[in-house]
A protein has these predicted regions:
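Methionine residue identity
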Residues: 1-3
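Flexible "arm" and connector segments at domain edges
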Residues: 5-8, 12-151
Length: 151
């Protein structure tokens, strides 16, 4: 990886110095893109090529990843003292953080199976976020199946 030379500057969450590789300065969308690239590389290493799946394979892998996420949610749940009858439990914040990242691995994989890029993912998130804000602003009294169709 090329090193930055003779350029030193700093702005919020973006610092470049002679000691760091060029990619230490990223926008948030660059970070999301890098996460997508990292996940794609990991999936390929595991033998899952999301770019060349049939529709039937895509359906199967969405189910596979959903099942994996179900297990990761159970592991996240076990990081939190949820057994009200058991006094010995402790909150394992470190493990909870790890489980959240495991969930993200599978969530990004599902997005890739569905042929979403990091840009698609961000755009859909932003649109859905606005739908949620609008629902809250209007009291969210009824479920409108059509308010998310544009996403």
């Amino acid at each position: 990886m090329p090193m930055v030379s003779l350029v030193i500057f700093s702005k919020k969450d973006c610092t470049v110095s002679l000691k760091f590789a060029h990619n230490t300065c990223m926008t948030n969308s660059d970070k999301l893109n890098e996460i997508f690239q990292m996940q794609q590389a990991l999936n390929l290493k595991i033998g899952v090529d999301t770019a060349h799946m049939t529709d039937e394979q895509r359906q199967q892998w969405v189910l596979n990843y959903c099942r994996a996420m179900t297990q990761e949610i159970a592991e996240l749940t076990d990081s939190v003292p949820w057994k009200w009858w058991a006094k010995y439990q402790k909150f394992d914040k470190q493990n909870a953080r790890v489980e959240v990242i495991d969930l993200l691995h599978f969530l990004i994989s599902i997005a890739q199976v569905l042929e979403m890029t990091s840009e698609d993912f961000y755009a859909a998130y932003a649109k859905k976020h606005q739908v949620n804000l609008d629902r809250q602003a209007t009291g969210y009294q009824t479920k409108d199946e059509n308010d998310s169709r544009h996403i």
